[in-house]
C-alpha cells in the first residue's frame, strides 16, 4: 500500500537502540529511573499504514532486558538479515503474550479494512478470501494469524526499512509534479491574456525570478563554512574556537549519541533563510522543503558511511578531516538552478491532465443528465401528487353535498323543523277537490261505550 511520510519523521523512533532506530525512532531517556516530571517525547508518525502496530511492538520489546541487550550489540546487517529476530525465542513469556495480542489486533484491523475495501468495490454477497487478501500486507506473516513469531519481527523490520527508504524518492517525484503543474497553469494563464497583458505578466515573472536569485551565498551543507556559521550565529560561540566534537554534542538534541534526520535538517535553517522568506511573493515554500531534503541527502551521502540514516560521532568527526570539508568556495547551488523536469516530461504530464480533465467532464455531463432526468421524474411525481389531491378534494365535496341533501329542512333561525305525527288520521283533501259523499258512506266517528251507572246503595 502506498505510504506518505512527513518530513523528518521516518527515523526518530528508538534511541538508544541505535540499529533499530534506523527503522524507527522512539526517544528514550538514558538516565536511570525516570522522574515523574519527565514527560515522554511524543513519537512522530512515520506515515506508514502500520505505524501504530510497529510502534507498539517496539514498545513491548523494549521492556525485555535480554532483547534490549542483544539489540544494542547488533549491527545493521544483523537486523536487516533477520538474525536478530531469532532472539525473540528468548524473551519472557509475558512479552510474548503481549506480542501475540498485538498481532491478533492487527490482523483484526486489517480484516475490517479489507472488508470495507471489498464492500466498496464488489457485490455485498461475494465471499472474500481474507487469507489471500492479507498477503498484500507484507509487514506480518499471514500464515500465522494468532501468535507473534520471529518471522513477524523480521518482516516488520524489513518492510519498514524498505518503505521508509523510498520516502525521499517519492518526495522528489511529488515535487516534480508540483513544478510541472505550476508551469502548466502559468502557460494557460498567459494564453488567456491579450498581447499587452501577456507581456506585462511575463515581465512581472522575470522580475520575481530576479529578486529570488538575489540572495547571500549559500554554504554547502555539512561544510566547515556552514557548520561554523551555525556555531557562531545559532550557538553564539566564537568561530575561531570551532570544535567539531563540541558541535556534535550541542546538536545531538536528545543525547542519543547520533544525529538523526531532524537534527541534521535543523542545521540547515540558517542557509534556507538566506533564500526563502514566506513574506516574499517570489519565494515558494514548497521549493524550500525540497531544498531542505536535498541538503540532508547531500550530508548523508558524504557522512553516513554505513548508510543507516544516522550520523554517529565517529562518522561526523571523520567527515571534518576530508579535503572537501574546507573547499567549498563556489557555494551551494539551489534547486531553481536544476530543472525539475524536461519538456518531454511536461508534455506527457499535460497529456495526462487533458485525459483526466476529459474524463471528469464526461462524468460531469453524465451527472448533469442524470440530474435532469431526476428533475423530470420529480416533476411527474409532483403532477401526479397534485392530481391525486384534486381527486380527493372533489370526492370530499361530493360527499358533503350528499349529506346536505339528505338532511331535514331547517327553520329560518337554523333550527330543524319537525312535523307532528298524525297517526292513522286521514289527511283532508284540499279545498275544491272534496266530492259529495252519500250519508251511508260517511264514517261516523266511533263513540266510546257508555258504562251503566251504579247506585251508591249497590256499593
UniProtKB/Swiss-Prot annotation:
Subcellular location: Golgi apparatus, cis-Golgi network membrane; Cytoplasm; Secreted
GO molecular function terms noted in the UniProt entry: calcium ion binding; DNA binding; G-protein alpha-subunit binding; guanyl-nucleotide exchange factor activity
Modified-residue entries (Phosphothreonine), positions: 147
Region described as Disordered: spans on this chain: 192-220, 393-459
Expression sites (tissue/organ): Minor constituent of the mineralized matrix of bone. Detected in calvaria, rib cartilage, liver, kidney, spleen, brain, lung, skeletal and heart muscle with highest expression in calvaria and approximately half the amount in kidney, liver and brain.
Annotated region of DNA binding: 171-217
Residue ranges of domain EF-hand in the record: 239-274, 291-326
GO CC annotations, alphabetized: early endosome; endoplasmic reticulum-Golgi intermediate compartment; extracellular region; extracellular space; extrinsic component of Golgi membrane; Golgi cisterna membrane; Golgi-associated vesicle; lumenal side of Golgi membrane
Residue ranges crossing the lipid bilayer per the database entry: none
Matching PROSITE patterns: EF_HAND_1 (PS00018), EF_HAND_2 (PS50222)
Binding-site residues, Ca(2+) 1: 252, 254, 256, 263
Keywords attached to this entry: Calcium, Coiled coil, Cytoplasm, DNA-binding, Golgi apparatus, Guanine-nucleotide releasing factor, Membrane, Metal-binding, Phosphoprotein, Repeat, Secreted, Signal
Biological process, per Gene Ontology: regulation of protein targeting; small GTPase-mediated signal transduction
Region (Binds to GNAI2 and GNAI3): 227-320
Residue window of motif GBA: 302-332
Residues bearing the modification Phosphoserine: 85, 368, 456
Range of residues in the leader sequence: 1-25
Binding site for Ca(2+) 2: 304, 306, 308, 315
This protein's record includes keyword Oxidoreductase: no
Skewed-composition ranges (Basic and acidic residues): 192-209, 433-445
Function field: Major calcium-binding protein of the Golgi which may have a role in calcium homeostasis. Acts as a non-receptor guanine nucleotide exchange factor which binds to and activates alpha subunits of guanine nucleotide-binding proteins (G proteins).
PANTHER family: NUCLEOBINDIN, NUCLEOBINDIN-1
Family from the record: Belongs to the nucleobindin family.
Protein's recorded name: Nucleobindin-1
Amino acid at each position: 500500500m502506498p505510504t506518505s511520510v512527513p518530513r523528518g519523521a521516518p527515523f526518530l523512533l528508538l534511541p538508544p537502540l541505535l540499529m533499530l532506530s534506523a527503522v524507527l525512532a522512539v526517544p528514550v531517556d538514558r538516565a536511570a529511573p525516570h522522574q515523574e516530571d519527565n514527560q515522554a517525547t511524543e513519537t512522530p508518525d512515520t506515515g506508514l499504514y502500520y505505524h501504530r502496530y510497529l510502534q507498539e511492538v517496539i514498545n513491548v520489546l523494549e521492556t525485555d532486558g535480554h532483547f534490549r541487550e542483544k539489540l544494542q550489540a547488533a549491527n545493521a546487517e544483523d537486523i536487516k538479515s533477520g538474525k536478530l529476530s531469532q532472539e525473540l525465542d528468548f524473551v519472557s513469556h509475558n512479552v510474548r503474550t503481549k506480542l501475540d495480542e498485538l498481532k491478533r489486533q492487527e490482523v483484526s484491523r486489517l480484516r475490517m479494512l479489507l472488508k470495507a475495501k471489498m464492500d466498496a468495490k464488489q457485490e455485498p454477497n461475494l465471499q472474500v478470501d481474507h487469507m489471500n487478501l492479507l498477503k498484500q500486507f507484507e509487514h506480518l506473516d499471514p500464515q500465522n494469524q494468532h501468535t507473534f513469531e520471529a518471522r513477524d519481527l523480521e518482516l516488520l523490520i524489513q518492510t519498514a526499512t524498505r518503505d521508509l527508504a523510498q520516502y525521499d524518492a517519492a518526495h522528489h517525484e511529488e515535487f516534480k509534479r508540483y513544478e510541472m503543474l505550476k508551469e502548466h497553469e502559468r502557460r494557460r494563464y498567459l494564453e488567456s491574456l491579450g498581447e499587452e497583458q501577456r507581456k506585462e505578466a511575463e515581465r512581472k515573472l522575470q522580475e520575481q525570478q530576479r529578486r529570488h536569485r538575489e540572495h547571500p551565498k549559500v554554504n554547502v551543507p555539512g561544510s566547515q563554512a556552514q557548520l561554523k556559521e551555525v556555531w557562531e550565529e545559532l550557538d553564539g560561540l566564537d568561530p575561531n574556537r570551532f570544535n567539531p566534537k563540541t558541535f556534535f554534542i550541542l546538536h545531538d538534541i536528545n543525547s542519543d549519541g547520533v544525529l538523526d534526520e531532524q537534527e541534521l535538517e535543523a542545521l540547515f535553517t540558517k542557509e534556507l533563510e538566506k533564500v526563502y522568506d514566506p513574506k516574499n511573493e517570489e519565494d515558494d515554500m514548497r521549493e524550500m522543503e525540497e531544498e531542505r531534503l536535498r541538503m540532508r541527502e547531500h550530508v548523508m551521502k558524504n557522512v553516513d558511511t554505513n548508510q543507516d540514516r544516522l550520523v554517529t560521532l565517529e562518522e561526523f568527526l571523520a567527515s571534518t578531516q576530508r579535503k572537501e570539508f574546507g573547499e567549498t568556495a563556489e557555494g551551494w547551488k539551489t534547486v531553481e538552478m536544476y530543472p525539475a523536469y524536461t519538456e518531454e516530461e511536461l508534455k506527457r504530464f499535460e497529456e495526462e491532465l487533458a485525459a483526466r480533465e476529459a474524463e471528469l467532464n464526461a462524468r460531469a455531463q453524465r451527472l448533469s443528465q442524470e440530474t435532469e432526468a431526476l428533475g423530470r421524474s420529480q416533476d411527474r411525481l409532483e403532477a401526479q401528487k397534485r392530481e391525486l389531491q384534486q381527486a380527493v378534494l372533489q370526492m370530499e365535496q361530493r360527499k358533503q353535498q350528499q349529506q346536505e341533501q339528505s338532511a331535514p329542512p331547517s327553520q329560518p333561525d337554523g333550527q330543524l323543523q319537525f312535523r307532528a305525527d298524525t297517526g292513522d288520521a286521514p289527511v283532508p283533501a284540499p279545498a275544491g277537490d272534496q266530492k259529495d259523499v252519500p250519508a251511508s258512506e260517511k264514517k261516523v266517528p266511533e263513540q266510546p261505550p257508555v258504562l251503566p251507572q251504579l247506585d251508591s246503595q249497590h256499593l
